[in-house]
Amino acid sequence: MTFKDLFSVQSASYAKFRPDYPPALYAWLASQTPGHAQAWDCGTGNGQCAVHLAGFYENVYATDPSAQQIAHAAPHDRVRYAVEPAENCGLPDASADLVTVGQALHWFRFEDYFREVARVLRPGGSSPHGRTACRRFHRRSTRWYFSCTKARSAVTGCRKTA
């Protein structure tokens, strides 16, 4: 399967305008691992998640198959960027305490990617992918937002649809 780079043309705009995740997410991710030596942010894009993870991990290895995305990634002393596919990372075996993916998992070849995650995760490491982890975080961190949105909709007469 050949990588089709759909993000190079607008990589500067993507880096400038992509919304960020709440700071509580990064603290929660860090709380899921006993060690904090190495994180791998796969499909890093502009490095947004990688830079935040650098506040919790000594080293962050941030990869993306798009050279243009990496070229526009935010620099940080603890983040090392590499142009690599998700399915073939340059980290050694059992070297990562945490593996994250922001909004890129749907682009990956799942079987090959999860095999790579299993290879690079050290014992006790965490890779909180999937709906369960997202749902748990979402419930805890955004409940107040949706409560406020419902209240605001009731006051203004607008109806929010999902």
Regions found by a protein language model. Give the residues of each.
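Class I SAM-dependent methyltransferase SAM/SAH-binding core
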Residues: W40, N46-N88
